[in-house]
Every structure is written in C-alpha cells, then in structure tokens.
From Swiss-Prot:
The modification Phosphoserine is found at residue 56. One of its GO terms (cellular component) is microtubule. The keyword Iron does not apply. It comes from Mus musculus (Mouse). This is T-complex protein 11-like protein 1. The gene is Tcp11l1. Keywords: Phosphoprotein. It holds the Pfam family Tcp11. Residues 16-30 have a biased composition (Low complexity). The keyword Ligase does not apply. Residues 1-12 have a biased composition (Basic and acidic residues). Residues 1-57 are annotated as: Disordered. Belongs to the TCP11 family.
Amino acid sequence: MSENLDKSHVDEAGEAEAAASEQGLEGALECSDETLQKKVKSDSPSSQRVGRPHSSPARLVTVEELLETAKGVTNMALAHEIVVTGDFRINAVELAEGSLEKRVKEIVHKAFWDCLSVQLSEEPPTYDHAIKLVGEIKETLLSFLLPGHTRLRNQITEVLDLELIKQEAENGALDISKLAEFIIGMMGILCAPARDEEVKKLKGIKEIVPLFRAIFSVLDLMKVDMANFAISSIRPHLMQQSVEYERRKFQEVLERQPNSLDFATQWLEEATNDLLSQKYKHALPAGGGAAGSGDAPLLTPVSVQNFAYLKLLKWDHFQRPFPETVLMDQSRFQELQLQLEQLAVLGAVLLVTFSTAAPGISGHADFAEKLKMMVKTLLTDMHLPSFHLEDALASIGEKVCLEVSSCLSLCGSSPFSVAKETVLKGQIQALASPEDPIRRIMESRIFTFLETYLASGHQKPLPTVPGGLGPIQKELEEVAVKFVRLVNYNKMVFCPYYDAILSKLLLRS
C-alpha cells in the first residue's frame, strides 16, 4: 500500500521508515499478521517424517519449549518466504464454497446485520450495535496511520469520539449518515489507488445497514493492502539481514532440539557415498582391476554439496523426510522437480519426432515452436493424480503425426509414410516409462546442464546446453536460474553447518 503515502503526506513516509528501522527486523516479524503465517504454512508441504532415526539421544521437552521452538521456526520461515519470493503478497482469505466455516460465517453475519436493521428501525432508533461498529471502524482507520499522521489521527479521534456519539444517541441528535460520510472520506484518503473505485461506490449507498456492510468489506481489502505495504517496507531490511537472521534462528532451534540436523546429515552422507562411488568407478582401470591407492578419488565440500542439491531434484517426497536445512524450500524444490520431469518428456517427444519424421523439419523454427507448445499444453497436468501419461502420449502421437504430415506437405517434401508414422507413435508412447532409454538420456543431459551451471558459479552467459536439448533450452534455463538461486541462498545461510558435517564425512571417506 505504498500508494497511500502519495495520497497523504509524502514527507511523513521518511519518519515512518525510520520508526520501522528502529523497531528492528525481529519486531517486524514478531508483529507479522496471522495471515502471513497461514500463507507460509500452506506453501510448505509436510516434511513426511516417517521412520525417523535418532542420531542424538531422545530427551523430554516441555510444552513451553515446543511452543518457543515453533515460534522461532515460524518467524524464520516468514522471513525466508518474504526474501525468496520476490512477489510475496497476502491475498484476502476466500472460504471454500459450501464449507462449514463459510456457512457459519454467513449465518452469524446475517444475524448481526438483521439485529442492526431492527434496532435502527425502532422508534426512537437504538444505536447500541451501530456505535460498536463505529468503534471498530475507528480502530481500523487508526491502524492504517503512520507515526507521522498526527493531523489525520486527531481528526479521526475527534469525529469518532464514542462517548460523544453515545450522548448524541441518547439525546436523539445522532446523525449516523454524517458519520458514515466522514468515514468514507477518510477511507478515500487512506486507501490505495486500486481501492478508489470501491470507496467511490460507497457514496452511492443510501441505506445505513447495506452501507456499513460495504464499508467493512472495503476495510478488509484495505487491511490486506496495508499488510502488503508493510512487507514491501521491511523487504530491503530483510534482504540485508536475512542470512544472519535465519542462521541465528536455526541455531536457537538447534540448541533446543539437538537432533535438528539428523536428516541433513543423512542427506550429505548419502551424497558423499554416491559421489565417491561414481568417481571410484571412473577411476577403475579399463580391465576392471582394483585401483591403486594413488588413484583414490578426492572429494571437495563444494562438489558434495552441489551433488546433494541435485539429489533434491529426484527426491521421493512421500517416503523420505526432507533435510531440515532445506525444509522451508521443499515446495520450491518439488515444483522444480516436477518441471524437470515434464521437460524431460517434452524434450524426448521432440527429439524422437525430429529424428524420425525428417531431419530437416526441425529447421523450420515456426513449426518447431508450434509443435513444442502443443505438446507442452497436453503435458500441463502431467503430475495431477487424474492425469494418465500413457493416454496423453497416445493423443500426442496422433496430433504430432498430423502436424508433421501437414508440415511436410507445405514444404513440398515426401509425404509421411504409414510405416514412419507407426514407428513415431510407438516411440512417443514408449516415453511413458521412466526407464525408456530416450527419456533417460534426456534426464541425464538435463542434470548434466544443471550440474555444469551450478559448478560455474552462475556466471553469464549460461553454459551451452547438451545436444538434443535445443528445443527446450529456454524452459531449461529458466528452471536452472531458479534452482541455482535457491541453492546459493541456502548455502549462504547454512554453510557453517554443512562445513562441520562434511569435514567429518570427508575425513572418514
């Protein structure tokens, strides 16, 4: 709601920012709206901690310790969410249609507004409920003010003086319409430009009860705007301090729960063993004999960490607990994993199409892009439970053959034979199996590209994509940039813990 500053006193913004800085990062997060916490919780999937091994002895903890730990984790997750998600915003809560919660809310609200309508219809009118509403509106308007908004604060306090309003009601001198007019005017001053239209519509409502209902509806939207304004205000401070803040909060959690690095240790140990096994195989002589001691492969902490992050893109989120140090980004890693799986199938379909149909057909940029978008659209819901990849690939095979035949006809090339069409459909349908050789080649090349980009220190330009990935280069580079950004931020926060764990693992290896 940064627009609010432009609509009142711009010079007061500096005072407000200074006040916010004095409160500090901790205070800003401690006072965060409950809605923010709900969003963080909804964006973070369950850690699926099944069959948890304990590397540290179990100890009894009090309820207070658990609550304090949960509070620390929530604040850490909130700071992380705001920093990592550049467009982090709070949206108004929408209750599901037909839900019990929505039904109860509707019944309670209807009863309240009906009661207000009855009171105002009496002779003389009773203003008990109306005065309570004015009090709530007053508190809401005051909450929108910045520390420097002295004049506006005085106006609201003076006009919406509840004691004076009660006296006027008792003496039959209360003009509720005049109060509503002041409230709407003040809302127009404090609201973001995006709410101007809603506030303007309030002026056209003449009946008191519908007017108050509409006022509260717009005020709810303004609360969301204010929360988003607060987020945008503290984001620069978070960016400066988030690494130290997250590390400090995680250390507090670790001190209360010493086994909070169990899964991270397992993750790094598994990566070390897998990488060591790979390098050892490559170090073996061609004859298959044992490698000498001088040939023993050496691992570095960086190579193990990079390999460990790549393993997160093939994680079984339903059966394996996610490492604690990357838990707040589990949903992001999971999203990247799904995108890469879809890209592997998409790339494989395009590869077999261009190699089977006619080598020269891929040179037609418009056709290649059209074909890619068509296949991509048909694979959009690939990871929904209701999606059947076999059926989708059968449909894709039919459509691809039609597009290829049409393109060959327009180019004046030899027509697409029935034999080639049958082969192409069969190859596309075979991609439904994760073990299909072409699909596995695509996955291998995709991970080779990610590994190269990660090891390059995300320097520009990006590494050259391996052969066969050209048609999906744009999509792959977008995923790679997101992946490396996540990895580098995670390294900055948790590098001391990773270094401590890997120093022991590599020494033992």
